[in-house]
Amino acid sequence: MEKKDMLYEGKAKKIFGTDDKDTVVVYYKDDATAFNGEKKGTIEEKGVMNNSITSMLFELLEKKGVKTHFIEKINEREQLCKKVEIVPLEVIVRNIAAGSMAKRLGLSEGRKLDTTVFEISYKNDDLNDPLINDYHAVAIGLTTFEELKEMYSIAEKVNNTLKEFFDEQGIILVDFKIEIGRFGGELLLADEISPDTCRLWDKKTGEKLDKDRFRRDMGNVKEAYMEILKRVNK
């Protein structure tokens, strides 16, 4: 595999082409952003940690029957992945009230929800990734109802697998967001699963072990990511 020119640079990753039209190299950066890019910073070694965490979690999910874009970890910062066409939606899965949902609905952070909540947001930086519903997504041509049904099914499988896995590591999976890509007529889990994209709380202490530490200036951000890596890597 030969790495080629950069195809795209996002907030947390760079995507490079390869000599195979169906694969890309994903490079994990140390850059950190919050509030749709309004807050910017750097977390030392974040890219290294998130690459490792995502690689291990994607391998776990593959074993549990969730198809992903992940092929292999190349080095400490890079993965080889299938070149998917990203559906311009984020699927957000919430097990416990926190973050924007708690604020929006006037719920106390940490409240256990009576059922898992699934939301979608439109991936559009100019619009600050607004929450939309299924009908919006279909009406403006982002997806179909059939595809959405499959996306929610993937999200549910990911949630069930990771909730159980993290619980065994003494971690509560509060919520997370995923992206999904089209590849060869299939939908694949894409992007990453890491403390950048999940809320993860210590089961005993309630300590936040995710990007909320950066968002809220809580300190010890690198240490929190390292703790997640340590537990995932048990």
UniProtKB/Swiss-Prot annotation:
The protein's enzyme class: ligase
Known EC number: 6.3.2.6
Pathway participation: Purine metabolism; IMP biosynthesis via de novo pathway; 5-amino-1-(5-phospho-D-ribosyl)imidazole-4-carboxamide from 5-amino-1-(5-phospho-D-ribosyl)imidazole-4-carboxylate: step 1/2
Gene3D superfamilies: ATP-grasp fold, B domain, Phosphorylase Kinase, domain 1
Keyword GTP-binding: no
SUPFAM superfamilies associated with the record: SAICAR synthase-like
Keywords: ATP-binding, Ligase, Nucleotide-binding, Purine biosynthesis
Reactions mediated catalytically: 5-amino-1-(5-phospho-D-ribosyl)imidazole-4-carboxylate + L-aspartate + ATP = (2S)-2-[5-amino-1-(5-phospho-beta-D-ribosyl)imidazole-4-carboxamido]succinate + ADP + phosphate + 2 H(+)
One protein family per Pfam: SAICAR_synt
Molecular function GO labels: ATP binding; phosphoribosylaminoimidazolesuccinocarboxamide synthase activity
InterPro entries documented for this protein: SAICAR_synt/ADE2_N, SAICAR_synt_PurC, SAICAR_synth, SAICAR_synthetase, SAICAR_synthetase_CS
GO biological process: 'de novo' IMP biosynthetic process; cobalamin biosynthetic process
Domain of life: Bacteria
NCBIfam families from the UniProt entry: purC
Similarity section: Belongs to the SAICAR synthetase family.
Name of the protein described by the UniProt record: Phosphoribosylaminoimidazole-succinocarboxamide synthase
Lineage, broadest ranks: Bacteria, Bacillati, Bacillota, Clostridia, Eubacteriales
